[in-house]
């Protein structure tokens, strides 16, 4: 079974470089198309408490959050465009996308909507209570996507 479409879910960690290299190598071997994806992590529940908790002050606060997210999106677009250029120089077809929200859910949705054959992502290595309380994007993805998943670890 080949991997014609590979979704590469990156974060801004050092491990992301290894994730990308693994995906490029696979893309070269399989003649795949890559979708390099980054999600600016924002928990929607966190944002929803501000208006009710802070009342009128939340309006100004939400404007600050909006500006900060726009700045992060601009930085992410520039970062992803440079990655796509690198991937294409390595001879692999590549595109990119960026979203804001919960990474696991966006990766799931991207894999489904883009019809990915494989998702490649890293793993922080959380164990025990840390994984339970902080959550694990890789664990969520493994349990919620319909395609194969490659987890890259340190």
Curated annotation (Swiss-Prot):
Return the SUPFAM superfamilies for the record.
Adenine nucleotide alpha hydrolases-like (SSF52402)
Give the source's domain of life in one word.
Bacteria
| InterPro entries documented for this protein | Rossmann-like_a/b/a_fold, Universal_stress_UspA, UspA
Q: Which CDD domains match?
A: USP-like (cd00293)
Recorded family membership? Belongs to the universal stress protein A family.
What is the protein name given in its UniProt record?
A: Universal stress protein Sll1388
């Amino acid at each position: 079974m080949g991997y014609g479409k590979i979704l590469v879910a990156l974060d801004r960690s050092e491990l992301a470089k290894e994730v990308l290299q693994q995906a490029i190598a696979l893309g070269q071997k399989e003649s795949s198309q890559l979708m390099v994806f980054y999600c600016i992590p924002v928990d929607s529940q966190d944002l929803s408490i501000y208006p009710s908790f802070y009342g009128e002050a939340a309006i100004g606060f939400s404007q600050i959050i909006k500006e900060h997210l726009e700045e992060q999106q601009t930085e992410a677009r520039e970062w992803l465009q440079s990655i796509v250029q690198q991937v294409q120089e390595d001879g692999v077809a590549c595109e990119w996308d960026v979203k804001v929200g919960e990474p696991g859910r966006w990766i799931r949705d991207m894999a489904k909507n883009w019809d990915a054959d494989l998702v490649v992502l890293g793993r922080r290595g959380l164990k025990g209570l840390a994984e339970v309380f902080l959550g694990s994007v890789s664990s969520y993805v493994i349990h919620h996507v319909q395609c194969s998943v490659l987890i890259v670890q340190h």
